Design a protein with these regions (language model features):
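N-terminal Rossmann-like NAD(P)+-binding domain of SDR-like oxidoreductases, especially those catalyzing
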Residues: 1-143
Length: 143
């Protein structure tokens, strides 16, 4: 059974507030648009620092659906803490490019590790649910 096809679930979700991190990326923006098309009354916001190519184009598409973006760095807890309370946070944010991981380890750790920890703290404070999506790329570091 598809949750979006179930009327009871759809009525329940209309009252939901959902934040999608990495929401202007490929995966995040498609999830946001899919949910908005299926359940138009659900409040969907995104959090994205717009640092990747294509993010600004996706932002324009999201605006057409009434989806607001917070241009924050997920690794900055003082910004994450200011976000409103959400029922669900869908974490699509990741620094997944292998080349970036080789030349800017701090950036990768700040986004992928510290950022996820910041979301967990925010969820714990607000009793929100977290849906975590992993990177499409897994790589190792030679020690």
């Amino acid at each position: 059974m598809n949750i979006c096809d179930n009327r009871i679930a759809a009525n329940f979700l209309k009252k939901m507030k959902i934040l999608i991190t990495g929401g202007c990326g490929f995966v995040g923006s498609n999830i946001a648009v899919f949910l908005k098309k299926k359940i138009s009354k659900v409040q969907i916001d995104t959090l994205d620092n717009l640092s990747r190519k294509g993010s600004k184009l996706n932002l324009l598409r999201l605006k057409k659906y009434g989806i607001k973006n917070y241009r924050y760095d997920i690794g900055n807890y003082s910004k994450v803490k200011r976000l409103p309370k959400y029922h669900f946070i869908i974490d699509c944010c990741a620094e997944a490019a292998v080349e970036v991981s080789k030349r800017d380890v701090d950036r990768v750790l700040n986004t992928n590790l510290v950022g996820t920890f910041n979301l967990l703290k925010k969820c714990a404070e607000n009793k929100s649910n977290l849906i975590f999506l992993s990177s499409s790329r897994v790589f190792s570091i030679d020690l």
